[in-house]
UniProtKB/Swiss-Prot annotation:
Subcellular location(s) of the protein: Nucleus; Chromosome
The name this protein goes by in its record: FACT complex subunit SSRP1
The UniProt record lists the keyword DNA repair: yes
Species name: Catharanthus roseus (Madagascar periwinkle)
Gene this chain is encoded by: SSRP1
Domain of life: Eukaryota
Amino acid sequence: MADGHLFNNITLGGRGGTNPGQLRVHSGGILWKKQGGAKAVEVDKSDMVGLTWMKVPRSNQLGVRIKDGLFYKFTGFRDQDVASLTSYLQSTCGITPEEKQLSVSGKNWGEVDLNGNMLTFLVGSKQAFEVSLADVAQTQLQGKNDVMLEFMWMILLEQMRKNSLMEISFHVPNSNTQFVGDENRPPAQVFRDKIMSMADVGAGGEDAVVTFEGIAILTPRGRYNVELHLSFLRLQGQANDFKIQYSSVVRLFLLPKSNQPHTFVVVTLDPPIRKGQTLYPHIVLQFETDYVVDSSLSISEDLLSTKYKDKLEPTYKGLIHEVFTMILRGLSGAKVTRPGKFRSCQDGYAVKSSLKAEDGVLYPLEKSFFFLPKPPTLILHEEIDYVEFERHAAGGSNMHYFDLLIRLKTEQEHLFRNIQRNEYHNLFDFISSKGLKIMNLGADKAADAITAVLQEDDDDAVDPHLERIKNEAGGDESDEEDEDFVADIDDEGSPTDDSGEGESDGSDSGNEEIPTKKKPKKEASAPKVPLSRKKVGDDDNMKKKKQKKKKDPNAPKSISAFMFFSQTERENVKKDNPGIAFTDVGKVLGDRCNKCQLRKKHLLKQRLVADKKRYTDEISNYKNPQPMNVDSGNDSDSA
């Protein structure tokens, strides 16, 4: 071409890998267009400050450095293109390209050259590699001599690149002469500070609009100086430094803690920040609720009156969490979520609970549930398949608590444990008002049915030992036990404690057969029944009392859920395990019963309900015989 050179199949290297396109070098500068359009890079010749040629595998690379510190790399030139393009650039731009050599020795020690926003690692005088500091998301000082750089890897993944540089670590010994330190500030710290000062050149190099010092952050844990810039948020700690673009801020949450002088401010991110191998989609900041600040923004009046009109004010005075949230909302444009209509029994905004092994608080919000502080877990209502209330066994140490299971449409489950029972009605009413599907005890239930079941549980929990004492005094010990077992259908487990399920979540109340339950009831109730006799009698009276307690073999008996399951599955167990010992059949049945599907448990419960009605009628007739009816029945039989 008379007015320049045109090259096809030239790739632009940088963030997101390489992008193929077309490059045109003309008298006014350089223009590169991506294949398919949408993206173009134009460099005016007046902005060029340096040009380099480098031999790379199978082609040549042209490097263009501009005044802003940016460095563009165009790859795909043939050997014969180098000479013609060099002479053209000399005549039109007045810059002679410099030839650089690539180190192929494989050595991993050398020197670092920091120029503009580029970090170049040199082995001797040859370049081993270079990275753009504009892509550095954060820096970490590991120990006294290692500095790790982590890159904006999520942006790379958005470009659908299978392989990308995520982090790189430099070892800076104390004997380093390029970055001289002292006892309090080793060379690695000097190198990290230099990187941090250069990583913000260009569009992100503006001064902080406002800085909040010494803020406690629970996730990722530490104390940080929080800097709010025009285009990004910065968390600067003693060992970690995070730079977060406002485009990554999805939503802000302002959530007061119940009965404590602190308030959570949560910054939800997409993509999340990364520390080592851990991702942090939520930054949890904790402010003192009553702390008042007076802040002035370092921002020009032109920006305040144009871009940030009705979004920011020149000065703010108020509670620190309110001031921080308002400024961050104005800069990022993210929406703020506050507590909704839910109130706990203590008029708070959350209920205490545990998630996995961590204690925290669960916030029922208008469109989501949020568990804080660790691990911060956000569950949107639209992602929920159903919720389930799970009670703890009556009479146990945890009888005053219940669990809340939230199952997502992706089949993932979140179990919030040890919620106080007096929070049930508030939670149930709130969840019902949101139209969320509620399941209880492993089966679909209507709202009123669930309420009735849980109310029964509450009644049972008032004084369960009183009913046991009454039944034992009446000589019918097994009746109350079977009724109690029906209420605990979902806590039912294997017929023996050797089933291997002792570590499951329901091990406190389940994984035991009815005879196993009878033993502690006898031990617990035996001293209570003869308590008054002990004052007037002796040990012989207690022995006589125990000898009198004999069961009538003709008394009606109820059938447990495990017995129903055993009747239907015993033959299948024998078929699946030929030659299995008789003592092992019960263990296998117990394992299968614990792992049986929701539908099968529902069928078992239906059979239990039917059997309970039968048992209730028979035991009523057994306890209250009617002589006339019995005589007439005998007459008819004899006849």
